[in-house]
């Protein structure tokens, strides 16, 4: 949808410390301001009320934030609240106002949540979705915000507090309430606590305050007095008991001895421009001063690691290295794990925001004596979970740079404590949380079979000590959630390898994370339709009805597979027939309409396959953009109704069945593709000057076009024209950095990588697309084709088969047969033979072809048609799906993406013209123009198979383009 206007509400920026704060300052990056975005709003949506309820016990804070938004506009809106959280904060709950009552959200896989939200919002009912985006950024989507009405939402945030001085430091997340017309604070701390200054003083453990958002200070922080002694709590919850041990430990002020050679992994990707280089250099100044003399092995990380360079450090002087870092221009995607460890390097510093957008997710193997420290200055845009998981699993720590560089240096130069745990039987999944280690605390989490299991701990090579006696807690959900949060942190060291485990954990404990979101639906029918188990009152009825639904679904799956097998048999009948290769007879009377009937093959298989049709009239010319969508739809409906009603009566049989398969064409088949070059104003400007300086000219233009995907596509094409492939791939990879949650952009990136003959790079991109949304069969097909092209045919079978067997929305009808063509071709041509035991044997016959053309495109809600004109002058298209000589066109895709396929088993000699007819798009395009991808194949399914692929970007209007030609001699 194209919006004419977008209003945003700035809720608050955390910019200062309050005068009444009574605790030492703890330096940690502050969150930036939340934004409420209401597209198409003429007046800004108002935050009417905010209620913040906070409670602290044993160093753990839980805050419940209830917000009421009012829409003063005369139209229904969708609202999107974007907000960051500080490092260590975790969302543990979300609720949405449904018919006046707050209904708790339930966890769902992230891609599933997005799919369900968008489908339900299109029906105009009440979903709410909370998801994590980049780093520690979150997005809450609410629909509808009624015209002239209000909606309430509630967030629950949990965090372990930092210890400083003589107590726990509690900072209230006021940023959510600052813009509210009315605010209420209700806080509870241990009963003996008194802290802070009026009017925000906690007395006897309580604080109640009412007022306006404008009266709130920029930040409220209290120091809650607490004894520095070990405390152990155990509580039951669901499947077991959960333990939290808070252990004071000694910290050393003596810096550790640095090795004489260190490795510096410097993130030079496009997102590096948002880091604070001044803070990073200030930290490195002190680090190299402590190092004195030594060597630095520098590796700049982008879409691929640049060649390593070595620099000498003399008496702390690192000016040469500093100049090299200053010369790094941010560009390309972030392949943070794609580098080679050097045996001589004993310590690595990774300076990055942790937002891995490219390549593998598991770090290279480090030797036991090699450490990794991670450093970020990107604030809330940091993926602190990943960086902490990587560094702590490799003997180092994560340092989030704040305003106090001396504190950050002390943390970087101190040695992480060696902590060992001796757990008895019945103790599972012990996790050590080191986030407060610099303040002299360790938090130990574990899952227990019972509450009396003994455990011992040894810190820093000291004596083994038994944990103190446990205190029984009544808040099992809180302790279990903290354990799950720490366990997720541990698994994040290999996020891709542990994705399923992380998703199960997040769903079990209701945590929002990289792969799990929280969703609220309006009706029980919605929960049943999407197989999402609700919370609260709806759960019992859901469980009873869902058991019946499961049995029905299994029967429907079997029926669907039978239907696909029947349609595949019909295609075999078409393939086994011989078709005339002479000049077609002149059409007489109304028989001309037969070839134009827009009927599906499966509706009249035998008659259709037995009868080659006369030559069809020319396909209609493209319509004007202003009329195209409505007229295309109605014209197709009229054409289908009038022609298909007559089809069976008017067919004259001129072809015959053959007992043996017809022979494929043995002659020469050539392909000639139409040339295409980017012709934007920027592309024309960049072409001027020497080719050797093209990349430099691009860098000079980059900042001005950083939000334009079309810019990066144009530049990549120009670099490929000049033979600068590696730089072209770098520029192309910027699409992965632009919008981390935009699968449409990633799909375009994957297609362009395939066109550039880089399928190994395309595979992880298409894996990301699939992880973001499994509701579109193209996501499975794209991954399967990329795996096959990357030399992984066995792995390619699974996603291709999913296209065949899964139920899809009706707008994707026909894609199953196209994927089956690709799957059976892969099986037939692979050596050694593939394992096909999981595939229905009815679906395994391969059908080689002389000619195959497949058209797909990168925009949803857009219509494009494949036209193939043969030597008879007959055009195969959506209205003429079966030609006189047996050319077959697949079903028409009018809703987006495609694919559409033309197949011809035995090609008549002559020229075949391939065109794409674009009807236009009904949505705002991520690249500013629709991109078509057309694959032309000769001798499909044989040893002589030859593929060529062309990509073109079309203007956002109706047009017909010549893509290429086949010639059969």
Which positions does each model-derived feature cover?
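Intrinsic-disorder/low-complexity signal
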Residues: 829-969
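N-terminal, polar/Ser/Thr-rich
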Residues: 21-58
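An acidic, Ser/Thr-enriched
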Residues: 93-99, 103-133, 137, 141-265, ...
């Amino acid at each position: 949808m194209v919006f004419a206007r977008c209003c945003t509400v700035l809720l608050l920026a955390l910019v200062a410390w309050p005068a009444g704060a009574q605790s030492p300052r703890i330096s940690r990056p502050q969150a930036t301001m939340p934004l409420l975005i209401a597209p198409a709003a003429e007046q800004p949506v108002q935050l009417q009320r905010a209620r913040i309820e906070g409670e602290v016990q044993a160093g753990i804070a839980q805050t419940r934030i209830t917000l009421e938004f009012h829409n003063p506009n005369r139209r229904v809106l969708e609202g999107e609240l974007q907000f960051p959280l500080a490092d260590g904060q975790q969302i543990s709950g979300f609720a949405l106002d449904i018919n006046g009552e707050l209904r708790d959200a339930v966890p769902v896989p992230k891609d599933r949540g997005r799919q369900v939200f968008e489908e339900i919002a299109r029906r105009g009912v009440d979903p709410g979705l909370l998801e994590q985006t980049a780093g520690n950024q979150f997005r809450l989507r609410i629909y509808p915000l009624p015209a002239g009405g209000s909606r309430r939402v509630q967030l629950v945030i949990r965090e372990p507090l930092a210890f400083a001085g003589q107590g726990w430091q509690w900072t209230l997340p006021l940023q959510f309430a600052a813009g509210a017309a009315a605010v209420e604070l209700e806080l509870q701390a241990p009963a003996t606590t008194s802290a802070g200054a009026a009017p925000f003083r906690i007395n006897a453990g309580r604080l109640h305050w009412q007022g306006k958002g404008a009266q709130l200070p920029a930040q409220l922080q209290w120091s809650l007095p607490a004894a520095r002694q070990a405390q152990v709590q155990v509580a039951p919850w669901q499947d077991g008991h959960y333990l939290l041990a808070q252990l004071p430990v000694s910290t050393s002020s003596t810096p550790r001895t640095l090795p004489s050679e260190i490795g510096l992994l410097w993130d030079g990707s496009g997102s590096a421009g948002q880091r604070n280089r001044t803070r990073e250099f200030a930290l490195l100044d002190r680090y190299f001063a402590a190092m004195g003399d030594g060597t630095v092995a520098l590796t700049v990380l982008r879409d691929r690691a640049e060649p390593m360079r070595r620099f000498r450090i003399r008496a702390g002087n690192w000016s040469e290295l500093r100049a090299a870092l200053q010369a790094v221009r941010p560009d390309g995607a972030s392949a943070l794990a794609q580098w080679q460890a050097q045996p001589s390097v004993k310590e690595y510093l990774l300076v990055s925001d942790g937002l891995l957008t490219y390549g593998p997710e598991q770090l290279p193997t480090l030797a036991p004596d090699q450490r990794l420290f991670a450093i970020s200055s990107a604030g809330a845009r940091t993926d602190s979970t990943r960086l902490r998981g990587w560094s702590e699993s490799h003997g180092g720590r994560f340092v989030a740079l704040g305003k106090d560089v001396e504190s950050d240096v002390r943390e970087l130069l101190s040695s992480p404590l060696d902590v060992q745990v001796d757990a008895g039987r019945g103790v599972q999944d012990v996790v050590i949380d080191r986030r407060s280690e610099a303040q002299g605390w360790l938090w130990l989490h574990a899952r227990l079979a019972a509450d009396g299991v003994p455990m011992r701990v040894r810190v820093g090579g000291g004596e083994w000590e038994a944990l103190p006696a446990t205190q029984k807690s009544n808040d099992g959900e809180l302790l279990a959630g903290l354990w799950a949060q720490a366990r997720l942190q541990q698994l994040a060291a290999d996020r891709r390898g542990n994705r399923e485990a992380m998703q199960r954990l997040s769903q079990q404990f209701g945590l929002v994370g990289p792969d799990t979101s929280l969703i609220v639906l309006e009706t029980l029918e919605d929960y049943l339709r999407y197989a999402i188990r609700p919370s609260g009152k709806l759960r019992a009825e859901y469980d009873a009805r869902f058991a019946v639904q499961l049995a029905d679904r299994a029967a429907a799956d079997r029926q669907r597979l039978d239907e696909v097998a029947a349609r595949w048999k019909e295609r075999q009948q078409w393939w086994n027939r011989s078709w005339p290769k002479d000049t077609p007879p002149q059409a007489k009377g109304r028989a001309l309409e037969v070839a134009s009937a827009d009927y599906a093959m499966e509706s009249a298989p035998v008659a259709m396959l037995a009868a080659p049709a006369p030559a069809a009239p020319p396909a209609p010319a493209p319509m004007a953009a202003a009329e195209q969508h409505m007229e295309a739809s109605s014209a197709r409906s009229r054409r289908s109704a009038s022609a298909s009603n007559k089809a069976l009566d008017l067919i004259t049989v001129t072809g015959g069945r053959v007992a043996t398969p017809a022979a494929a064409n043995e002659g020469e088949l050539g392909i000639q593709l139409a040339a295409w070059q980017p012709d934007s104003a920027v592309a024309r400007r960049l072409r001027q000057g020497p080719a050797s300086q093209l990349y430099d000219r691009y860098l000079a233009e980059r900042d001005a076009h950083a939000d334009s995907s079309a810019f990066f596509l144009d530049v990549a094409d120009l670099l490929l024209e000049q033979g600068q492939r590696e730089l072209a791939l770098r520029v192309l990879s910027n699409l992965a950095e632009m919008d981390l949650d935009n699968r449409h952009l990633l799909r375009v990136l994957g297609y362009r990588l395939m066109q550039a003959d880089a399928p190994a790079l395309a595979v992880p991109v298409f894996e990301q697309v699939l992880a973001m949304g499994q509701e579109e069969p193209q996501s499975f097909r794209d991954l399967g084709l990329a795996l096959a092209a990357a030399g992984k045919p066995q792995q390619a079978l699974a996603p291709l088969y999913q296209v065949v067997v899964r139920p899809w929305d009706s707008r994707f009808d026909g894609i199953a047969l196209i994927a089956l063509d690709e799957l059976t071709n892969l099986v037939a041509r692979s050596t050694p033979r593939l394992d096909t035991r999981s595939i229905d044997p009815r679906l395994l016959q391969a059908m080689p072809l002389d000619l195959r053309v497949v058209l797909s495109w990168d925009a949803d809600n857009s219509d494009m048609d494949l036209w193939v004109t043969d030597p008879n002058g007959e055009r195969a298209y959506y209205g003429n799906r079966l030609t006189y000589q047996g050319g077959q066109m697949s079903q028409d895709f009018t809703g987006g993406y495609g694919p559409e396929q033309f197949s011809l088993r035995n090609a008549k000699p002559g020229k075949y013209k391939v065109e794409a007819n674009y009807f236009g798009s009904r949505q705002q395009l991520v690249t500013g123009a629709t991109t078509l991808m057309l694959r032309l194949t000769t001798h499909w399914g044989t040893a002589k198979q030859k593929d060529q692929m062309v990509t073109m970007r079309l203007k956002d209007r109706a047009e017909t383009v010549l893509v290429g030609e086949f010639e059969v001699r």
